[in-house]
Swiss-Prot record:
Binding residues for Mg(2+): 42, 115, 118
Domain DRBM intervals: 155-225
Gene Ontology cellular component terms for the protein in this record: cytoplasm
Task performed by this protein: Digests double-stranded RNA. Involved in the processing of primary rRNA transcript to yield the immediate precursors to the large and small rRNAs (23S and 16S). Processes some mRNAs, and tRNAs when they are encoded in the rRNA operon. Processes pre-crRNA and tracrRNA of type II CRISPR loci if present in the organism.
Gene name as annotated: rnc
Compartments, record wording: Cytoplasm
Protein name: Ribonuclease 3
Domain RNase III residue range list: 7-129
Source organism of the structure: Shewanella halifaxensis (strain HAW-EB4)
Keywords: Cytoplasm, Endonuclease, Hydrolase, Magnesium, Metal-binding, mRNA processing, Nuclease, RNA-binding, rRNA processing, rRNA-binding, tRNA processing
Amino acid sequence: MEPIKNIPRLCRTLGYEFTEQAFLDQALTHRSASNKHNERLEFLGDSILSIVISDALYHQFPTATEGDLSRMRATLVCGKMLAEIAIEFKLGDYLKLGPGELKSGGFRRESILADAVEAIIGAIYLDSEIEKCRSLVLKWYESRLKVIEPINQKDPKTLLQEHLQKFRKPLPVYKVVHTEGDAHEQTFTVECIVEDLSQAVVGVASSRRKAEQSAAAQVLELMKK
């Protein structure tokens, strides 16, 4: 496997110098490029990210309910947020993708970018230890933790349901109208049907749940107009 270029620059951006660069190389390698890809590291990093953010929120909001803490954590560790961090790090410049993913613009795909951030967290853990991961993750999330609040953390589907119930309207209907791609990299197209709108609103994402949330968010925006 060819070495990934400009690794020293990426390490400066991350704020961490790897003892074993092989961990970072693997974290940046998509399954389309090699059998030694980043999915196991992603699994590890996902768990570490969850505990670090959970711990930070628990201490930052001593009076918040379990529901509020869960919603804030979901906001902070969601694919969209992780992809934003990846873009800040310019991770797309360093990813190793197979020819098909390169051609289709995989270095810009939210799910691939988000997975790479989690894989890097897993790689840092294996190269060092949990406390180093904690300090780095908290540094990466510093500005986001400063502005997160327990209020307004309900997801779009919940907000839409509550809005319709308030006005005694029928609940929305979500319908998967199309799926595309291999099992590990599927794209879901979901329609959200609401009585007050003349046509269904469509959401597209890497999972059914995310596609439903995307469609619900669009419906909420339309109902504000």
